């Protein structure tokens, strides 16, 4: 573990990146970034694990590694992550992204956005070794979200250095149950993996990587680690950086695309946040899902006021803040834009859920208020009837939608049906075969979009504003 501690001074804080120490060889073949969402219950050690992976240090058992990556003051003080944040490991030109998400149930909508809107390839479920997995706990909810979105995941068991043997045995039984329910083969990595010829990965591990990537054999690796003692930390880091992204595997023909129509799509960049930078202007951050985007390219941004406005790309930065000329498929970054459409536009008009594309007609055709879908209701306390409203999470979209059912039709838990859903606020860009989630209170479910009605052929619902109740104050009688 001395190599871990030595590299602290070499990493620095520049761009929040940790490098493997190998030179970046630009002549190497282009390899897209692998993205992992880091999930798990509160106090499981997610941020500490990400801090150890990113900074190449060991934790002191009192939140030191976590404090190095905390974004806000209250996160440093309380240790509770309330926002999603991305952290990067650069290894010989390949970028591995760790997306640290919230573990508290209060911030579940932020976690759902991270899973659906940040286009991750794999998941890391962090479980504290000295805790129990409750059937209705947050960890099980996160696992169900990953399974619903067809995202393979690795289970990382932290705090293994302070775990009693009986608790670990009980935890393994829970993992066996989860694997059998998901029809996955479980693989345990308990003992400390030794380095051999400069690598912690052996032939048996390569078989694991291949089965994890091609998804023909469904596996659920469970790795025991300790952020404090360094147990299996180097092994996990090398394993994560060795697994290739889904985009790279599709390009190589090793796996089939989830959506067969994706080859016919134009360039699409999904926006997950926007900024107004003094001296620069509007900056949009997001992921290029299809095609590529270049500096100087003239594109369309929207939907903005039910249309798409003309923009020009002035500058591009990749996910590690490097100034680049191009963002390729599956790469995340930010673009500085110039608005070419005349009009009055404010920063508030550019939000998550919008897209940047080079095909105006394609964008208008797929911008809808209403869409047809097939849904499955996982949980609901009573019955769902016509007009039921819930929040739809689809890629970077997060907007209330209203169910359109027949008057005599009702849905209950474990129901599956086809229906129309209508957005209540504004039209959104949606594509067929997209997976979406809906959640509201104790209601949970998912669906697959089958098609939409272009908003120019549809009419928005009229939202009735509720009158504010004014409490009448009785007049005081003035005595004579």
Swiss-Prot record:
Q: What is this protein called?
A: Putative GTP-binding protein R624
Q: List the disulfide bonds.
A: none
Cross-referenced PANTHER family: ELONGATION FACTOR TU-RELATED (PTHR43721), GTP-BINDING PROTEIN 1 (PTHR43721:SF9)
Annotated region G2: the residues are 79-83
List GO molecular-function terms, semicolon-separated: GTP binding; GTPase activity
What are the boundaries of the region G1?
40-47
Work out whether the entry's keyword set contains Aminoacyl-tRNA synthetase.
no
Q: Give the span(s) annotated as G4.
A: 158-161
The organism is Acanthamoeba polyphaga mimivirus (APMV)
Q: Which UniProt keywords apply?
A: GTP-binding, Nucleotide-binding
Q: Which stretches of sequence are listed as region G3? A: 100-103
Q: Domain (tr-type G): give its ranges.
A: 31-248
Q: Which residues bind GTP?
A: 40-47, 100-104, 158-161
């Amino acid at each position: 573990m001395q190599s871990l501690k030595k590299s602290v001074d070499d990493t620095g804080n520049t761009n929040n990146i940790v490098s493997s120490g190998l030179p970046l060889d630009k002549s190497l073949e282009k390899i897209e970034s692998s993205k992992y969402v880091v999930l798990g219950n509160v106090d499981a050690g997610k941020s500490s694990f990400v801090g150890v992976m990113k900074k190449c240090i060991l934790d002191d058992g009192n939140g030191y590694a976590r404090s190095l990556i905390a974004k806000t003051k209250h996160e440093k003080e309380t240790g509770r992550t309330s926002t999603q944040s991305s952290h990067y490991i650069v290894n010989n030109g390949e970028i591995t992204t760790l997306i640290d998400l919230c573990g508290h149930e209060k911030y579940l909508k932020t976690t759902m956005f991270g899973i659906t809107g940040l286009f991750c390839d794999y998941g890391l479920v962090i479980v504290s070794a000295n805790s129990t997995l409750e059937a209705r706990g947050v960890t099980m909810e996160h696992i169900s979200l990953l399974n619903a979105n067809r995202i393979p995941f690795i289970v990382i068991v932290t705090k293994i250095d302070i775990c009693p043997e009986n608790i670990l045995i009980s935890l393994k039984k829970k993992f066996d149950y989860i694997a059998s329910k998901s029809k996955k083969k479980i693989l345990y990595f308990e003992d400390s993996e030794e380095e051999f010829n400069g690598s912690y990965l052996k032939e048996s591990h390569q078989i694991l990587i291949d089965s994890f990537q091609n998804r023909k054999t469904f596996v659920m690796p469970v790795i025991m680690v300790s952020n404090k003692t360094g147990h299996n930390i180097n092994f996990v880091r090398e394993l994560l950086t060795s697994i290739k992204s889904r985009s790279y595997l599709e390009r190589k023909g090793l796996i089939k695309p989830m959506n067969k129509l994706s080859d016919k799509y134009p360039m699409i960049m999904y926006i997950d946040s926007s900024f107004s930078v003094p001296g620069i202007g509007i900056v949009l951050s997001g992921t290029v899902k299809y095609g590529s985007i270049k500096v100087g390219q003239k594109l369309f941004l929207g939907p903005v006021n039910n249309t798409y406005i003309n923009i020009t790309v002035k500058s591009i930065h990749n996910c590690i803040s490097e100034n680049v000329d191009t963002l390729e498929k599956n790469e995340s970054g930010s673009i500085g834009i110039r608005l070419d459409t005349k009009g009055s536009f404010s920063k508030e008009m550019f939000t998550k859920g919008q897209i940047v594309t080079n095909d105006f007609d394609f964008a208008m055709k797929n911008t809808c208020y209403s869409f047809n879908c097939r849904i499955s209701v996982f949980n609901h306390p009573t019955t769902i009837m016509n007009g039921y409203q819930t929040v739809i999470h689809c890629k970077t979209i997060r907007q209330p939608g209203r169910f359109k059912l027949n008057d005599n039709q009702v849905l209950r838990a474990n129901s599956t049906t086809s229906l129309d859903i209508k957005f209540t606020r504004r039209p959104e860009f949606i594509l067929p075969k997209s997976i979406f989630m809906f959640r509201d209170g104790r209601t949970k479910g998912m669906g697959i979009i089958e098609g939409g009605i272009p908003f120019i052929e549809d009419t928005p619902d009229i939202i009735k504003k509720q009158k504010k109740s004014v409490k009448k104050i009785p007049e005081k009688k003035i005595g004579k």
